[in-house]
Structures are given as C-alpha cells and as structure tokens.
Amino acid sequence: MKDIIIVGAGHLGLDVYALIKEINAVKPTWNIKGFLNDFPVDLDQYCIYEKVIGTIQDWIPGKDEHFALAVGSPLGKEKVVNLLKSRGVVFETLISPRAVVAKSAKIGEGSIIISTSSIGTCAKIGKFVVVGNTIVSFNSSVGDFTNTASYVNIYRNVIVGKRVQIWTHSVILNNVDDDAIVGAGSVVVAKVKAGTKVFGNPAKRMPF
C-alpha cells in the first residue's frame, strides 16, 4: 500500500476519498494519510475519520508520499499545482474501476475520473481534469484544469478548453473556450467564448 494525501477537503475531496476507497475495494493500493486544507473542516460529519493533517500552503512532501488533487476551482487548482510541484509533489491520476475508458483515449497527469464516466475512442483528457460521472464522446478533448460535474455529456469532436467549469446535467454540442462556465442543465449549441458564462437551453451568455 502506498501513502496518498488528498489535497483539498471540500466536496470534491469527499468524492476523491470515495474514489480511492472504490479503487482499494478492487485492488488494495492506497493508504489515505489524510487531507490538506487551508482552513479547518469537520470531516466527522461526513463519516470520514481521516483528518486534515496540514495546510496546502505549508506542506512539505515527505519521501514516498503521493498526492491526489481535489481542489474544486479550476483557477485555484492551477495555482495549487504550481505551488506544490515546485516542492517536488507528484500527483496521481485516479480512474474509477467502474469507468469505461477506451484504450485509445489519453488521460493526463493528476486527472480524476469518477465512477460511471465514459471516455470514448481517441478522446483526450488534459492534466488535472475532473471528469465526474460524465460522457466524453469519441475524438473530443477536455483541457487542463477543467471540471465537469455529474451527468455531463460532451458530444463527439467537441473541444473544451482549459480551466472550464461545466455544471451538472449539461450537454455540450459545441466548443467551449478557456475559462468559461457552463451553468447546470445547459445545452450548448453555439460556441462558448473564452471567459464567458452561459446558461439555459439553448445556452446563452449571462453576466458574472
């Protein structure tokens, strides 16, 4: 068993915790040492008995420690990655044993593929991406530091940029540029420009 520390103790941290337990149930792989978080969190309320063992800002990695990134904000996790990698942290790519991943698909460093996700033929998942119970269809791509919430469907040949947040039950039929936000339940039929927020069916631009 290898020691692993979960970076972030919010809702995504709980999902990553459950994912590691799911992996261990199939093949014992990880010993969860605890969480890193920059503010106090009571994990007992979630029936999680591992503790917050330090802060992200102050943690110095020890020998043979592995890390799972569970920071929810796309921009925030890029900053965390840059900070911790400068100290020598190595992030693990974690894939649920219940996910369906095509042999020709590519998944980048530090990405998290949760439960019943499906990654299609020739699909490309960048670095530090969260794929949450999402369908990523064939020949589509998802850029670095992007998050998809549960029950998102990314259509074939679609390109999703970097640091994008796509919320639950959205359908992505056209490209989404960097730093955009797609609101819950949206159907994207027209290209989403960089740095914009869209919502609705069909998805339309909304003020921040």
Question: Predicted regions span which residues?
Answer:
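Conserved Rossmann-like nucleotide-cofactor binding loop
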Residues: 12, 41, 204
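Short active-site oxyanion
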Residues: 3-4, 31-33, 64-67
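Phosphate-bearing ligand-interacting subdomains
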Residues: 40-100
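Active-site catalytic pocket residues across diverse enzymes, especially alpha/beta-hydrolases
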Residues: 20-24, 84
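Glycine-rich adenosine-cofactor-binding loop
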Residues: 2-20
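NAD(P)-binding Rossmann-fold cofactor-contacting core
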Residues: 23-44
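Structural signal for interior beta-strand "rungs" in well-ordered beta-sheet cores
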Residues: 93-206
